[in-house]
Amino acid sequence: FREAMKDSVIRYGEDIDFKEECWERFAKSLYYRPGNAREASYYSSLDEDLKEIGKRHGSDSRNIFYLSTPPSLYLPIIENLNSSGLAVKRRSDEPAWPRVVVEKPFGHDLKSALVLDEKIHAVLNEHQVYRIDHYLGKETVQNIMCFRFANSIFEPLWNNNYIDHVQITNAETLGVEERGAYYEEAGALKDMIQNHLMQLVALVAMEPPNSLSAEATRDERTKVLKAVRRFDPNKVDSYAVRGQYDAGYVLGNEAIRYRDEEKVASDSNTETFAALKLEIDNWRWAGVPFYIRSGKRLEKRITEIAVHFKAPPHKLFSNMANTGLRSIMADSSPNVLVMKIQPDQGISLKFATKQPGPTTQLRALTMDFKYGTAFGDHTPSAYERLILDSLIGDPSLFARSDFVETSWSLLTPVIEHWPAVSPETKSASDNSIVQGPFPNYEAGSWGPEASNTLIGSTGHSWRIL
C-alpha cells in the first residue's frame, strides 16, 4: 500500500521536489485496513486499530472519516461509526471531533437530501460534517471574495446600476467516460449545476459578510440562493434548457453519441447539457439575469464567470463613421470582467480604447492577470486546500446543510419536469423553448441551439470562447 501511495505521489504530484527521506518518514504513518463498510464487526476492529496506531505514534484519537464512497454507503457507514463509538455527537460549543467528510452528490433531490441530513444529524452535529465541493477549493473561486471585497474600485460597480448580466459557463470536452451508470441517474443539472455552479452564483452575488468566519460567509452565500426567484413549474421550458450530445468530433477526435456510451440506455433522455436563467430578487441584483450553462462534449474545456457591464448611458462615439468604432459600439457589453476558473486561472477585463492614429477609432483590448505568471505555475489543488481545511477545522469552503437544501429546493421544478416530459414536447407556456428531440447537439459544438434562444430572449448572447 505504501509503495502504491509513493508511486502515486511521484506520478501525480505537480512540481513536487520529492525527497526519499521525507517520504520514508511520512510513509510510516500510512495504514490500510480493508473491510466491508456495511458490516458492524469491521468497525470494532477499526476502532482497535486506530487506538493502537494512536499509541504507536503518540497521538490522541482525533479522527476524520472521508467518505469517498458511493452515496448509498453514506448512511450505513455513519450509523456503524456511531454504533461502534467511533462517531460521537458533539455540542456546537465542543471541539468538532470526530469529523466526517462527504463527497457529492448529497442526495439526488430535495426529499433525499432532507432525509440524509436528518439521519446524519441524529449522529453528528452540523459542525462535524464537511460536505466537500472541490470548486470552492479552486484558487480563482476563493479569489472572488478577495477580488470583490479587498478592492474598492470594483464593489461600488457590483450591482444592477452598472452590471447588465452575468454568464457562468462550465464546458467539458470529455464525455461521460466510464461513468455512464452514474450519469444516467444524475445528468448535467444534478452533477454540476446543483452544487458547483450554484456556489459560483452565490460567491458572485453575495453581500459582504461581517467577518471571514465560516458561519458569516456561509450565511451570505445561502442568502443569495434564498433570494433567487422560484421557478414556475408550468413554465420550466422558458427558463431551463437541456441537451444531449450526438456523435461528432472533439479536438479533432471522433466522439460517439451519448446513447452509445457504455451503460447508457439507447433511448436515454438524460441531459448532458443544461442551461438556466436565474433572477435574484433583492436590492442589488433586481433586473440582472444570471445565465448558467454546463455541458459535456463541447468545443473547448473552460470554466469561467463573465460579468457584462452596461454600455455608457450616452453613446458619445456612436456617430463616428469608422469600422473599428462601429464594431465596438455594436457590442452591448463593451466592458466584460472574466474570472477564469480553469484551465488557465486568472482574471481579465475588456475595455475600449483609442487606437493610435490621426482619427478617433476605438478598439477592444483586454488586461490579463494570470496566476501562473504572477505566482508560478504550481498552485495548490482544490483538494489540497480542502483536505487541509478539514484537518484544521475550518468549514468555510464546505457546503452547509441549508445551502444544499435551498439549492435542491430551487431546482425541484426542473428536476420534476424533465423526466416527465420528452425533450421534443412544446409546453403550453407562450415563452417555452422547443429543445428536442435528443440528441440535439453535435459533439464538438457549443450545445443545443435552444441555449442560444434562451439567452437571446432578453437580447443577450453567449460569449465566444
Q: Can you annotate each of these PLM segments?
A:
Residues 1-102, 106-465:
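Secretory/organelle targeting and membrane-embedding segments
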